[in-house]
Amino acid sequence: MSDVLAAIYRGDREEAARLAGGKELDVFEAAALGRTGRLEELLDADASLANAWADDGFQPLGLASFFGHVDAARLLVGRGAEVNSASRNAMKVMPLHSAAATRDADLRYAIAELLLEAGADPNARQQDDFTPVMAADQSGDTRLRELLLEHGASG
């Protein structure tokens, strides 16, 4: 894992931005930082990067979704990122699970809505059969819960 991604995972956005300065970001770093300009460059050069796998088992859409980058998620979906692809690790997280785990409620809702409209499964199950509705309930996000139910999630 790169130093940039490690800093992002630790929640140290300032350090991640410092480390990213002057560096040619890869698709995972660009997605996790929400750098849509860099994402566009990378996807223009190689469209398959929209569904590439990081060493930790995540794809760019999952990273953009988890870190609350609506524009990056929209770009990736528009470029063919798979909305129902589970991570290749023990968690089996899909982008909708990642969106449901975003800290900011408005970003969480916006990304979940984007993914659902693109065909994300509202009943997707990750590790231990955890669903997006369970994530909404856990965070007390009734607005997200209603959105999921409107798109066919089981209550």
Predicted regions and their residues:
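Ankyrin-repeat inter-repeat connecting loop/turn
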Residues: 49-50, 83-85, 122, 155
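Repeat-mediated protein-protein interaction surfaces in helical alpha-solenoids
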Residues: 6-18, 35-44
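Tandem repeat domain/solenoid detector
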Residues: 78, 82, 117-121, 150
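Leucine-rich solenoid repeat scaffolds
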Residues: 4, 8-13, 128-155
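Conserved ankyrin/ankyrin-like repeat signature
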Residues: 15, 38, 71-72, 107-111, ...
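Conserved hydrophobic site in ankyrin repeats
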Residues: 18-20, 42, 76, 115, ...
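Ankyrin-repeat boundary/"N-cap" motif
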Residues: 1-6, 22-29, 51-63, 86-101, ...
